[in-house]
């Protein structure tokens, strides 16, 4: 965990929170394009957690508070899926290795999606789940979570390695 002074902590946290809110709320303001930007909302929180775990947690909660003002449904989805995914990836990727990070981070959105579907009843998830049997729905959610977590972990690892190389060059 990197030590940060308070000014850097606040500035970096604010920038990453802003990026995460923009990406997560993109489907609200740009319905077609926003669906492609929304998955990128995991990356700012993961970057914050890689840099400093308390920073990742602060960004996570400030992200939820700001997003609640914009759209409560997006905030709930964030709380149980992409937000926790970012925290898990950021905490484990460079501390425990990519395999542990992929396995742990794929469980989080899987359980979150099941919770959003069967406990909270988010309409988009309920409509999808009603089209299939429960076992098939669970399998689809797990497969999607595993693929999504895998892509996020690999992309983030390559991105951080690229930034590290840039820092060494300059």
Regions found by a protein language model. Name each.
Residues 20-25, 64-70, 107-116:
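Aromatic-anchored segments of alpha-helical transmembrane domains
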Residues 33-90:
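Alpha-helical membrane segments and adjacent membrane-interface helices in multi-pass membrane proteins
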């Amino acid at each position: 965990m990197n030590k940060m002074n308070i000014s850097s902590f606040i500035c970096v946290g604010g920038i990453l929170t802003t990026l995460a809110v923009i990406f997560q709320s993109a489907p609200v303001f740009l319905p077609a394009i926003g669906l492609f930007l929304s998955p990128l909302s995991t990356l700012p929180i993961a970057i914050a957690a890689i840099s400093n775990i308390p920073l990742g947690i602060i960004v996570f909660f400030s992200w939820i508070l700001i997003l609640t003002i914009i759209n409560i449904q997006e905030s709930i989805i964030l709380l149980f899926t992409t937000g926790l995914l970012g925290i898990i990836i950021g905490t484990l990727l460079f501390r425990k290795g990519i395999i542990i990070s992929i396995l742990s981070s794929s469980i989080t959105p899987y359980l979150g999606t099941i919770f959003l579907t069967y406990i909270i009843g988010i309409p988009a998830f309920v409509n999808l789940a009603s089209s299939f049997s429960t076992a098939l729905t669970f399998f689809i959610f797990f497969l999607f979570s595993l693929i999504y977590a895998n892509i996020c972990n690999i992309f983030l690892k390559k991105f951080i390695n690229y930034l590290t190389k840039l820092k060494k060059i300059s």
